[in-house]
Swiss-Prot record:
Belongs to the eukaryotic ribosomal protein eS4 family. Residues 43-106 form the S4 RNA-binding domain. One of its GO terms (biological process) is translation. This is Small ribosomal subunit protein eS4. CDD domains: KOW_RPS4, S4.
């Protein structure tokens, strides 16, 4: 008997809360394949084409569009209908000229935000290591990695990455005054400015104090802060994020 995790489809009522789908509209949806994003934090390309963008009436039509090479993710043609797209990924439909960035709304759901640019992506540094030759490899939140000569970047900083070439355009430091989008906890999807970073000496995770547009402050985990600009957003965001 096949394991539950190996099934290609998933009943919609069992889908993660991050998926913007309605159980009453469809019984089944397509699970994203294992990849750069976890199942909870990604959507299958079929779900995006059929359910969100409404470019297909059913899975068969969505697969045809995808298999024809009519969808790009981060500047690369993707023909895998189960391909996982997640936070900050750039989806492009060349035939319509439309480009979207995957973001989180305040309910923690993955949503598409229509944008103009298609060659710039924000990627958070989740860890780094020294490799052969003394160079530094920084590993990013979407599974990508970039090799740099100098150890100038810290975990938590965000790279403005040119796609698909993986060239670094700019780096946004996670520091006081930085503009951040919260990606977890009860403040998911909120935009704010870093007021203070609290480093705990114990095994407890580091925390961060954020000031929102109403000048109210809240405490959240440092890991939940995703820098989107130095003192203002460098990218377009969902209206609900602002």
């Amino acid at each position: 008997m096949a394991k539950m995790g190996s099934r290609k489809h998933l009943k919609t009522y069992k889908a993660p809360k991050t998926w913007p789908i309605h159980p009453k509209e469809d019984t089944w949806t397509v699970k994203p394949s294992a990849g750069s994003h976890s199942i909870e934090n990604s959507l299958s390309l079929t779900l995006v084409i059929r359910d969100i963008l409404k470019l297909a009436d059913n899975s068969r039509e969505a697969k045809r569009i995808i298999n024809s090479g009519n969808v790009l993710v981060d500047g690369r043609v993707i023909k895998d209908y189960k391909f996982p797209v997640g936070f900050m990924d750039i989806i492009e439909i060349p035939k319509t000229g439309e480009v979207y960035r995957v973001l989180l709304d305040k309910k923690g759901r993955l949503q598409l935000n229509k944008i103009e640019e298609n060659d710039s992506k924000l990627c958070k540094i989740v860890n780094k290591s020294t490799i052969k030759g003394g160079k530094i490899q920084v590993n990013l939140h979407d599974g990508k990695n970039v090799i740099i000569d100098e150890n100038d970047y810290n975990v938590g900083d965000v790279i403005d990455l040119k796609v698909p070439d993986h060239e670094i355009n700019e780096v946004f430091e996670l520091k006081e005054g930085a503009c951040v989008l919260i990606t977890g906890g009860k403040h998911t999807g909120e935009l704010g400015t870093v007021s203070e970073i609290i480093v705990n000496e114990s095994s407890n995770p580091n925390t961060i104090i954020i000031e929102n547009s109403a000048k109210d402050e809240f405490l959240t985990l440092k890991d939940y802060a995703f820098v989107v600009g130095e003192d203002a957003p460098a990218i377009s965001l969902l209206e609900v994020n602002k």
